[in-house]
């Protein structure tokens, strides 16, 4: 049973570290392998601790859930890590050199995560009913949907060949460049002497697919990604219950196999260099990152921990129901308190061990429902399997050698699943309510808008045709530069505005706090009569 739970988790565990390390250090195979191994090891250790509940001496509080509830690296923090690391990597010293290396940027995010994780620790001592009132389904659902929407865009970029070359392809061959190519002008006749959209129509080549280097969106990349989706459908049609619960890892391995036997102009999609170079065993702390603090990421991270707090309560409720336990009992309240404390402490410990924040995984509730086994021993065995898979770094070598397009086919499915989960949460709210519809429309409108057009608040495409949201140098400030404090405030606001679920969740929380109930809007008093 433990292995079955581990298989249900592995696909989701490897994606966040894989994507973040691609952002931070590019194609460094050793760093990718380490990050994946670290995610598996830490998730295994924390799952064991979470399943085995501990009393805190001298208090009425506990640590851990005491049920079959697993912990894993959270998708919710991925967009913030991407945005913050990208912002730090874009900073330069006076001589034009990079201010932060990828490892330094990641280290700063780890330090900031340690500080922000204390919020969830504090919230673990707040009664769950108060948390539910503060963050109802309409707010939590918006947050989860926008996490999924933003990440799905990242998944599609990987499916087409890679996230970096996708950005360059859009920059060089975007819709506006098409206008220029047809005889249009960038600025119009009033602006002269300004070069048209940069890039000159050159192709953006993707280098994250083994020895194969082709333009973004090449048919070979699309086909390999589609092989993963095809296997997902086949498993759902013909697979056993066990296979359906392990559909992510089965489809990923199938796509990996297809890529392994495929060639493009004699070049391999899966060379064995990364597997051969991987050490036999590894563990956390093998790699070091200079721990720091990045102020601009604080508010987005705090919002993320608020969201995971409410998600954890919902996940534990689902676990109790799948385990056929009473959700109105004192034991459930104790599990919620211990689970939230476990989430916060383990996220702190994960950052201390160079990993990303952890939270409860909901997909394992399906395994419980199908197998009718809710024993904590299965959770402990699951944790041991995850640790074993992480320690055997050849496993990480195999995973890191997967072509970006194969990973993209899987992550598009996984990330959109997050969106669907949020949709399920929102559906529990009264969507006939005028108040809820306004909250949903405004927060989702802005959040999805930022997902579709992220450069509205910042010149992320590097084009001469968009104004920087808050310029720190250049013609919009007539050569003036921001001081350190102003730049920090600017970067913090920019990360908040360009991370879809941060701005969307903040709007939903604000509207929930200030909008009157429908009864008050239409002029009825609380006892049902006209006011």
Show the residue positions of the predicted features.
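Membrane-embedded alpha-helical modules
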Residues: 84-91, 98-265, 381-529
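Short, non-helical or kinked segments that cap or interrupt transmembrane helices
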Residues: 30-37, 59-77, 133-140, 243-249, ...
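Hydrophobic alpha-helical transmembrane segments of multi-pass small-molecule transporters/permeases
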Residues: 2-6, 66, 109, 113, ...
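Hydrophobic, membrane-embedded alpha-helices of multi-pass small-molecule transporters
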Residues: 1-13, 214-228, 245-247, 260-264, ...
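P-loop potassium selectivity filter motif centered on the GYG triad
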Residues: 46-47, 75, 185-189, 193-207, ...
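Hydrophobic, small-residue-rich membrane helices and short re-entrant helix-turn-helix hairpins
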Residues: 238-253, 275-293, 297-301, 314-341, ...
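Membrane-embedded helical hairpins/re-entrant loop segments and their flanking transmembrane helices
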Residues: 21-64, 300-376
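N-terminal signal-anchor module of multipass membrane proteins
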Residues: 1-68, 75-84, 88-99
């Amino acid at each position: 049973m433990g292995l079955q739970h581990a298989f249900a988790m592995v696909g989701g565990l490897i994606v966040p570290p894989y994507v973040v390390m691609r952002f931070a250090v590019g194609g460094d195979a050793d760093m990718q392998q380490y990050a994946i191994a670290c995610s598996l090891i830490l998730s295994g250790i924390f799952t064991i601790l979470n399943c085995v509940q501990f009393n805190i001496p001298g208090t009425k509080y506990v640590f851990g859930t005491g049920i079959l509830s697993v912990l894993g690296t959270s998708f919710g923090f991925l967009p913030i890590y991407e945005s913050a690391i990208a912002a730090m990597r874009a900073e330069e010293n006076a001589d034009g050199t990079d201010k932060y290396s990828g490892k330094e940027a990641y280290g700063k995010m780890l330090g900031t995560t340690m500080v922000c994780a204390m919020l969830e620790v504090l919230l673990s001592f707040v009664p769950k009913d108060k948390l539910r009132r503060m963050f109802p389904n309409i707010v939590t659902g918006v947050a989860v949907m926008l996490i999924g929407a933003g990440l799905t865009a990242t998944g599609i970029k990987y499916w087409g060949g890679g996230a970096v070359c996708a950005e360059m392809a859009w920059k060089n061959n975007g819709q506006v460049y098409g206008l220029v190519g047809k005889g249009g002008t960038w600025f119009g006749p009033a602006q002269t002497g300004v070069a048209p959209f940069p890039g000159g129509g050159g192709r953006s080549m993707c280098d994250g697919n083994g020895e194969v280097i082709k333009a973004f969106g090449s048919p070979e990349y699309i086909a390999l990604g589609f092989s993963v989706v095809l296997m997902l459908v086949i498993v759902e049609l013909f697979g056993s219950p066990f296979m359906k619960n392990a559909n992510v890892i089965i489809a990923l391995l199938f796509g990996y196999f297809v890529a392994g036997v495929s060639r493009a102009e004699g070049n391999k999609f899966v060379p064995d260099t990364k597997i051969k170079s991987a050490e036999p065993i590894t563990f956390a702390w093998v790699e070091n990152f200079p721990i720091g603090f990045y102020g601009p990421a604080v508010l987005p991270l705090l919002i993320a921990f608020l969201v995971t707090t409410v998600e954890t309560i919902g996940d534990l409720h689902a676990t109790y129901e799948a385990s056929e336990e009473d959700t109105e009992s004192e034991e459930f309240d104790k599990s919620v308190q211990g689970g939230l404390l476990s989430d916060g402490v383990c996220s702190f410990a994960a950052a201390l061990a160079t990993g990303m924040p952890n939270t409860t995984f909901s997909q394992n509730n399906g395994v419980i429902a199908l197998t009718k086994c809710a024993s904590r021993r299965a959770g402990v065995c699951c944790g041991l399997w995850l640790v074993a898979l992480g320690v055997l770094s050849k496993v990480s070598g195999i995973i890191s050698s997967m072509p970006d397009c194969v990973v993209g086919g899987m992550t598009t499915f996984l990330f959109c699943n997050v969106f669907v989960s949020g949709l399920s949460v929102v559906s529990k709210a009264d969507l006939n309510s005028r108040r809820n519809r306004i909250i949903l429309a405004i927060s989702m409108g802005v959040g999805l808008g930022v997902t579709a057009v992220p450069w509205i608040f910042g010149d992320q495409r590097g084009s001469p045709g968009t104004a920087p949201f808050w310029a720190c140098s250049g013609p919009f400030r007539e050569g003036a530069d921001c001081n350190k404090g102003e730049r920090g405030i600017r970067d913090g606001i920019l990360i908040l505005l360009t991370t879809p679920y941060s701005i969307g969740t903040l709007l939903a929380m604000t509207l929930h706090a200030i909008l009157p109930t429908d009864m008050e809007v239409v002029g009825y008093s609380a006892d049902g009569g006209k006011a």
